[in-house]
Amino acid sequence: MNEQFRIAHKLGLMFLHDTPLPEDVKAWAISQLHAKSPALGIKRWKFNAIGKEWPKSVQPNLLERDNMFSLYKYNRKREEMGLDGYTSEAAKRDNERKNLMGELDQLKFAHRNVYGEDQLKLRFTAFWANHFTTGNIWDNQNHIGHAIDEAILANLNGNFSHMLYKMTTHSSMLTYLDNCWSCGENSQEAIWAREDGQQAGLNDNLGRELLELHTVSPTAKYTESDIKNAANVLAGWGIWPGRISGEEHELLSTEQRHTKLRKMGGTINSWDFFKKDHAEPGTKRVLGKVIPAGKGGLKQLTDFLASHEHTINYISFKLAQHFVSDNPSKSDINYIVNAWKKSNGNLDQIHTAVIERAISSTEPKFQWPMTWLFQVVRLSGATYFKGWDEMDKYNQGIMDAREIFEELGQSFWHERQPNGYSSDKKEWLSGEMFERRIRFADAIYSKGYPYSTPDEIMDRIGANETTRSLVNSFTRKKDQFIALMCSPELMGLKNA
């Protein structure tokens, strides 16, 4: 594989079939960190479609998403109560179509990765979206896509400490790990609950994952006391999407809900929602760091954890394993660690170090199923996803984005564990997972109508002789396409 495509395969999503190739691929790769990132996609399916920017009307902001999901939940309550106009199948579908964002956001994510001109930024976005996993528990489906776009992609050129804070406080994370209900054992909310004979207390899910997965990792040898104290720092953060009380017949208008939110947290902004009545009073100690009481304590905690030695070492290894090699060397990891320390966590400098190390490394890098899928579609010029204007239209042979990701076996909108998807190829090399790639390569050829032939693709990428021999052992163009896209070279199993 030529140098341009070797780097685009390892660090990006492959050049689109009609994109000129850069002469200085290293300079191009580093410049990609500051590429513009509009959400590009297609309105309707057509052969050799060209990406255009998604309209604002299908990209609601966070408050609009909150209001939509709240309305969805209240309409579901009206349905349960048997109210006229809410119980028919048409009404149920209309409620989902108008107020749920999960399926549309998955299509937008697919479009970005297929038509985007910021391929390296999108790969780093996927890495961090996986690092800060927020699996779909239904009630956060309106927020997962927003977190990816606004907490991660929008902050790729900033500092890791800022991204950590923005993801920790995002509705998607606070909902996913049940922090919205958490309250300190000595909080006013807990006292009131005990007086009423009810239960209210601390949930340590997010406190635990903040230490174990998002920052220092178990190598820091934190204790259960550290986890509990981190959870106490987090107590009070977040508001559950949708209906906001357990009252059986609560049916609030948007205005009434906002009034209630302001009373509870002083704001209607779910990304800055802190309930003082749920907060644990007093200072807390986490890994020796004393954290003050109140809303500002969380920023002090995340800043401390972001610059911790164990955080730097742990995430540098993850970056190296994801982009450089399945088995990164100590020098690979240290190169990223040194860039992190010298820049005090500046993501531009960290990502530049990753790029430099990936380019200098001759090791192959196996690609995730979703990364491979996007690369195949981009390389071939196929049109494999519906347009944003076709969400409710049946297109024979073209699955919805949600169905594609489910069948592929990887999606940021799946129900999944907080540790996310592994970057280790051993987790993806089963016969079943390989058979899925064969099926998708077949479907992309048969239903996506690739613009380029297998021979044209091999010439453009500079495929090696082993790959060419494999492809040429078949006579049918479809079989050649499948063999090429599922070859060890294109999957990242052998040196390109």
Give names to the regions the model predicted:
Residues 2-39, 43, 52-55, 308-343, ...:
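Flexible, low-complexity segments enriched for small/polar residues
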Residues 3, 23, 53, 64, ...:
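Glutamate identity and glutamate-enriched acidic tracts
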Residues 7, 17-155, 188-192:
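N-terminal accessory alpha/beta regions
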Residues 71-73, 175, 221, 383, ...:
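Intrinsically disordered, low-complexity N-terminal regions enriched in serine/proline/glycine
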Residues 83-92, 105-109, 141-385, 495-496:
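Active-site substrate-binding loop specific to GH73 endo-beta-N-acetylglucosaminidase modules
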Residues 100, 114, 118, 142, ...:
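Generic detection of long, well-ordered alpha-helical segments
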Residues 106-114, 147-150, 159-160, 214-218, ...:
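Short alpha-helical segments and helix-capping/turn motifs at coil-helix boundaries
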Residues 121-123, 208, 318, 437:
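Basic side chains
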